[in-house]
Regions:
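Kelch-like beta-propeller repeat domains
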Residues: 1-386
Length: 386
């Protein structure tokens, strides 16, 4: 692997310009001091509303003290370019950014304050970030460049399947491959039975599941394919097709595993459906998790201008991702706060659901106002810290 120098490597994280959380901590006496976890996410970031400079940055949320900190800039990204449709997974204390598509932000001529995205390329690039040494390195590239694909870790190997190889056009692929982190090598896997993109990958029952997505198989009832899943048996080296595993013809937003259960909270059109759902593999159905009903992740006291005036008008959500840690589900939300052209900021809010509790499962931590506007580029990943 080739080492890289992050654009921020010469600057201490404590002095870098980045969305910085307010000095608010939340005592959590029920938490054990060890093990410690960090929830990492990649954002597009700009400091001012009319800012022409947009960066791709990675932040870390510490669930013990309810605080965001700047980790680093993502290397290899030009100014005003953002990365989307990539996978972000962890193996040990390393984070891998796999594939994705690069877009360039450009101002619209008719309205200089508004930006549009222009597709640049689909990447095969794989980056590795060590959370201990804070160093980036490049790994062996994907065999097939892809974005909007399924990805998950099983037995310390990274599995990817499906996705798209072009930025324009709704054309998916059915190829799959696996990365050995020790050998720094990608190996092709058998093709799935149908093409899929915007599908979700998750490891469940020691098998790599590729769930939902937009599909094509020539089926006269295409929604049947979009409701299905492909399951790769690592030991047998073959795919199985599971009908009706997702139930919707709209792709899922995110699926995680907690206490050996599959968990979902929304789809790509409605990322928060108002409740958490869990999968019953015996019935092949999704059911609401008891006590998880929560109509809105934004408290009613928050208004569109960031003040507490009792208005129910919601802020514009630009971030929502879910992470599982032990028996907890964390929902990390971010909302754009309107301001003048000289500044902008984001309100960060974290909710936690305790799957082991029988009542009062929800807890909402103190909101944080962070400098600049940061919009989520991909789902988060969890790292157990040494």
């Amino acid at each position: 692997m080739e080492s890289l120098t992050s654009p921020s490597s010469s600057t201490s994280p404590s002095t870098e310009t980045f969305p910085r959380s307010s000095l608010i901590t939340v005592p959590m006496s029920s938490e054990r001091p060890n093990p410690r976890y960090g929830i990492y996410a990649v954002f597009s970031y700009k400091e001012h509303m009319d800012d022409d400079s947009i960066s791709c940055v990675m932040g870390c949320y510490d669930p013990l003290i309810n605080t965001w900190s700047h980790e680093c800039f993502v290397p290899g990204m030009n100014d005003n370019h953002i990365l989307k449709g990539f996978a972000m997974v962890s193996v040990g204390t390393s984070i891998y950014l796999v594939g994705g598509s690069v877009y360039r932000k450009e101002k619209v001529k008719e309205n200089g304050a508004r930006h549009t995205e222009v597709g640049v390329e689909v990447r095969s690039l794989v980056l590795r970030y060590d959370v201990v040494t804070k160093e980036w390195s490049t790994c062996a590239p994907l065999i097939t460049p892809r974005h909007d694909f399924a990805c998950s870790v099983c037995d310390n190997k990274i599995y990817v399947a499906g996705g798209q190889t072009t930025i324009d056009g709704a054309i998916g692929i059915s190829s799959a491959e696996v990365y050995d982190v020790l050998r720094n090598e990608w190996t092709p896997l058998p093709f799935m039975s149908i093409v899929r993109y915007k599908c979700v990958g998750v490891t469940y029952q020691k098998k790599f599941h590729v769930i939902g997505g937009f599909t094509y198989s020539g089926n006269k009832m295409p929604f049947m394919d979009r409701c299905s899943a492909e399951v790769y048996d690592v030991e047998k080296g073959k795919w199985d097709h599971v009908r009706g595993m997702w139930q919707l013809d709209v792709p899922p937003n995110q699926i995680v595993v907690i206490d050996n259960k599959l968990i979902s909270s929304g789809d790509c059109l409605n990322v928060w459906k108002g409740q958490i759902e869990t999968y019953d593999r015996n019935l092949n159905l999704w059911f609401p998790l008891e006590g998880s009903r929560k109509e809105n992740l934004l408290p009613i006291a928050c208004t569109s201008d960031g003040n507490d005036r009792g208005s129910s008008e919601p802020l514009q959500r630009i971030c929502l991702t879910m992470a599982s840690i032990e028996t907890y589900l964390y929902f990390l939300a971010g909302y754009r706060i309107a301001g003048d052209h000289s500044s902008c900021c984001t309100m960060s809010m974290v909710h936690r659901f305790d799957t082991s509790a029988t009542n009062n499962q929800w807890e909402t931590f103190e909101p944080m106002q962070v400098e600049g506007e940061r919009e989520l580029c991909s789902h988060c990943c969890v790292v157990q810290l040494p």
